[in-house]
């Protein structure tokens, strides 16, 4: 069996993550796990934050099981936090998988243009995003280092209070709502 790859798409909304994830899905025969598609299917116009984390966690569990079975997987969430990326890098390593991290960035003007175009062309696949939300999210985004992207940088230790990245992952992405 060949070594599976976990592809991580990293970036803010409308930067090209899902477009790239769809290409990776086909080119690498990968299971693509795109949170927004699941949120829309399950919640429609609603976008409850409590459900978002649970859906991400369930999709991660599915993706990690697929890796254990030897399949390539694309996690298409944004992964704005370094801890999120470290937890997934460690989970992949624990399962003998490679990680390919792809970071996507566009100018704020291009992002706004893409968001508006998406809202016009395929409103059923997205939610309206205000400029205020974009600015808040950009401030929260922890841009990956070049070492994170290439894999040459060691995976950080889990944050204080967490013995392992698996324990942190279960806390970050809870198994159920509530």
Kindly give the residue locations of the regions a language model identified.
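NTP-dependent small-molecule kinase module
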Residues: 27, 139-178
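P-loop (Walker A) phosphate-binding loop of NTP-binding proteins
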Residues: 12
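Hydrophobic anchor at the beta1->P-loop junction of P-loop NTPases
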Residues: 9
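Conserved substrate/cofactor phosphate-moiety recognition/catalytic segment
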Residues: 15-71
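Phosphate-binding P-loop
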Residues: 1-3, 66
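Conserved nucleotide-binding/hydrolysis micro-motifs of P-loop NTPases
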Residues: 37-39, 80, 105-111, 160
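A glycine- and Lys/Arg-enriched "phosphate-lid" helix/loop adjacent to the NTP-binding pocket
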Residues: 93-144
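Glycine-rich phosphate-binding loop used to anchor ATP phosphates in small-molecule kinases
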Residues: 51-99, 103-105
């Amino acid at each position: 069996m060949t070594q599976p790859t976990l592809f991580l798409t990293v970036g803010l909304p409308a930067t090209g993550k899902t477009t790239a994830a769809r290409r990776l899905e086909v080119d690498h025969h990968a299971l693509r796990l795109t949170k927004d598609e699941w949120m829309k299917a399950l919640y429609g116009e609603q976008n409850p934050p409590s459900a978002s984390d649970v859906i991400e966690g369930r999709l991660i569990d599915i993706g990690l099981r697929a890796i254990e079975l030897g399949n390539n997987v694309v996690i298409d969430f944004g992964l704005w936090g370094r801890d999120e990326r470290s937890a997934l890098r460690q989970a992949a390593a624990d399962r003998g998988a490679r990680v390919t991290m792809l970071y996507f960035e566009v100018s704020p003007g291009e992002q706004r243009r893409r968001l508006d175009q998406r809202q016009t062309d395929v409103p059923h696949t997205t939610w309206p995003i205000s400029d205020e939300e974009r600015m808040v999210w950009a401030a929260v985004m922890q841009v990956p280092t070049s070492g994170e992207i290439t894999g040459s940088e060691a995976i950080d230790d889990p944050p204080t209070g967490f013995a392992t990245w698996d324990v942190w992952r279960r806390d970050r992405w809870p198994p159920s709502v509530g």
